[in-house]
Amino acid sequence: LFDTPPDLDIVRNIYSSIQNVIAVGDPRQTTYSTHHSQKYKKYSEGKVRNFFCEHLGELCEIDEITLSKSHRNEQIVCAISSQLFPELTPSVSCECCDDSHIEHLGAFYVPESKHLKYLEQYNPIQLRWDSRNSKVNPKFIAMNIGSSKGLTLDRVLLYPTKNMIDWLNDENTQLVQQTQSKFYVGLTRAKYSLGILVADNELSKLRQIIPIYE
């Protein structure tokens, strides 16, 4: 894990002294920062790719294709989540994982009026921004989006913030970096199904990119 200015200096020294180095990372999942140093500040908030281009351009090449296939997410989830970062190579669902025998695959808007029914039917992990979310049902497992980073969950019910809802209405909505990254993490935890809880009166305003759970 490299996320401080001294770490980036170490990375530069490694590339300068070792012939074959492979570094792997996903700038879309920069959900938090442990430092606020001015050095290399312009490479914070998921901009570490620029560090490699500007400081290590002659020592390495950036490959955005080899690991662009997801072995976790359904294609619709890959498509939606990739829209959050249009400047990056979109991810696509792999062809080696056949989940066609699984019921209820993909992504769905879940009306608040069907909230409990959805939880009881599919028992998804509830992902929220933080513990202050009053819509979370305490009878079912819940966790913060940031804590779910790196996990693969069979089914997820995401509790979007207002800004996330705004983006689902208009993909040109500007999100601050932390919201953008946490939204990406929340969207991409589920292997089989992703539910997004939405107030009934908001459903007609959203982009019809996924079906509504009935």
Residue ranges and their predicted role:
Residues 1-185, 189-214:
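Conserved helicase motor core of SF1/SF2 NTP-dependent helicases
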